């Protein structure tokens, strides 16, 4: 969320016994945190999913709200003042890129923060151009922001922050939706900006290998948001290696365990794409696609940001009409011989045939609790309540959500939201599951557990399609691959 004025001195961060408890919750997201970050330092914050990393960044950005949104203890300061009083010094890239795209044109969105802080108009557009180039977003400034992919929106959000030369740059999984080349471009853009301005950088990221070479310090948070390790990157990782692995933190040189697949004997096709074109009436994205989605097989959809992975996923899910060619279901997968195109199926017909997990999990939440969210689909289908309740309990346990069953889905961490969105589609046992970035926001432990669950689902005969940038996911699970160029 861009909120920084031009300055060339890094900000100092201080936490003194700081804690935050979200409204209506019994547990603390962060508890008794003591932390001091010197001006100009670059700090990588690690911790298992749900350890309060995002809450800490939101607190530093002054975005946690007042007493009606939660309870605060201790002190959290930026340059000796409350973060809300220092917003002209702070720029944050949120975990969800959609939530900080404000205006309809790329250039206007980057310029928005500078306009609010009174930067002279003559200086704004050169800074817009520089920021867009620095993050590798080579698009016209007039480009409609609604046409951007998730990864492009992440770059746009970062450009808006860097254009304002903040003293404190806060990054919450800034590369989660980026391809491998984009990850390095964004990291290098951040380090170049910090080199030029002296800004303090605090980055939260599950995958450590990208950021370890460019940070001065690693801070590891435990389950309650307390510091359990703090120091220079290499010695801290080496000294705490076993503890970090047991806590579910990704450690360089420790790949996830191999998963043994037990593929079903029959792999008949469920969907066939014939010269398929996907996109929107005014914005075609991809044409000439020919492939089959088969029962019990995992198909990975890969490619650089902006190549149409999410658009293809929505089309396969029956949520976006093809722009050309055909997407046909095979009997008996189709509701009837005359209704073979998923775009024409009713919502209840989709629930048991094709279920889709969106790139942004919040786009599919409709209820006020985690458990109710999982039960929503079965209720619509009027499934047996006893069997459904048992299945919901099983999924809550498998996806480490049992202790959050009564939480509002919107108060979960990014990784928890992703696992909940997966649970909501598995509960109805569809024949085909379409997932957009299924491993987003996962620590090592929850990643392994989620991938193992999807492997079991595929082995049971369910077809799985995953649009992903996660090479390890592809290597472990994919039987087939659709590479979009």
Describe each PLM feature range.
Residues 225-249, 472-476, 484-485:
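Conserved beta-strand-loop-alpha-helix hinge in the C-terminal portion
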Residues 169-173, 433-437:
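Catalytic Walker B motif of ABC-type/P-loop ATPase nucleotide-binding domains
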Residues 73-86, 326-349:
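ABC ATPase NBD Q-loop/coupling interface
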Residues 144-148, 152, 408-412, 416:
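Conserved ABC ATPase signature
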Residues 158, 186, 422:
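Hydrophobic anchor residue at the start of the ABC signature
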Residues 61, 317:
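Helix-to-loop junction immediately C-terminal to a conserved catalytic motif
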Residues 122-140, 386-404:
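Conserved ABC ATPase "signature" region
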Residues 162, 425-426:
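ABC ATPase C-loop
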């Amino acid at each position: 969320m861009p909120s920084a004025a031009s300055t060339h001195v890094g900000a100092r961060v201080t936490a003194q016994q700081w804690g935050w408890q979200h409204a209506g919750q019994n547990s603390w997201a962060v508890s008794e945190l003591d932390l001091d970050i010197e001006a100009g330092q670059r700090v990588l914050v690690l911790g298992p999913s749900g350890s309060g990393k995002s809450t800490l960044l939101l607190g530093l950005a002054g975005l946690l709200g007042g007493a009606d949104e939660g309870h605060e203890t201790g002190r959290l300061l930026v340059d000796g003042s409350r973060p809300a009083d220092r917003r002209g010094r702070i720029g944050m890239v949120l975990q969800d890129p959609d939530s900080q795209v404000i205006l309809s044109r790329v250039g206007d969105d980057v310029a928005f923060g500078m306009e609010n802080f009174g930067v002279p108009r003559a200086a704004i557009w050169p800074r817009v151009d520089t920021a867009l180039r620095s993050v590798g977003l080579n698009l016209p400034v007039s480009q409609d922001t609604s046409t951007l992919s998730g990864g492009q929106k992440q770059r746009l959000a970062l450009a808006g922050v860097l254009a304002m030369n903040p003293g404190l740059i806060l990054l919450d999984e800034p590369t989660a939706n980026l391809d491998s080349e984009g990850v390095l471009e964004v990291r290098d853009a951040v380090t170049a900006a910090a080199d030029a301005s002296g800004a303090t950088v605090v980055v939260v990221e599950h995958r450590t290998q990208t950021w370890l070479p460019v940070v001065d310090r690693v801070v590891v948070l435990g389950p309650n948001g307390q510091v359990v390790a703090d120091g220079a990157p290499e010695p801290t990782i080496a000294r705490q290696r076993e503890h970090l692995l047991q806590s579910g933190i990704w450690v360089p040189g420790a790949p996830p365990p191999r998963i043994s697949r037990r593929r079903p004997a029959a792999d008949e096709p469920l969907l066939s794409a014939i010269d398929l074109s996907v996109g929107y009436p005014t914005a075609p994205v991809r044409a000439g696609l020919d492939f089959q989605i088969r029962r019990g097989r995992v198909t990975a959809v890969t490619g650089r940001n902006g190549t149409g992975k999410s658009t293809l996923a929505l089309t396969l899910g029956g949520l976006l009409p093809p722009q050309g060619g055909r997407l046909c279901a095979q009997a008996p997968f189709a509701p009837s011989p005359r209704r073979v195109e998923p775009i024409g199926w009713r919502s209840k017909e989709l629930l048991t045939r094709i279920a889709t997990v969106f790139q942004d999990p919040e786009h599919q939440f409709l209820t006020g609790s985690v458990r109710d969210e999982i039960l929503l689909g079965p209720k619509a289908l009027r499934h047996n309540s006893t069997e459904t309740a048992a299945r919901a309990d099983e999924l809550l346990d498998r996806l480490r959500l049992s202790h959050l069953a009564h939480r509002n889905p919107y108060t979960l961490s990014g990784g928890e939201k992703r696992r909940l969105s997966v649970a909501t589609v598995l509960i109805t046992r569809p024949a085909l599951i379409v997932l957009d970035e299924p491993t987003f926001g996962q620590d090592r432990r929850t990643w392994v557990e989620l991938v193992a669950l999807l492997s079991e689902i595929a082995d049971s005969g369910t077809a799985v399609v995953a649009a992903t940038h996660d090479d390890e996911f592809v290597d472990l699970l994919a039987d087939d691959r659709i590479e979009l160029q």
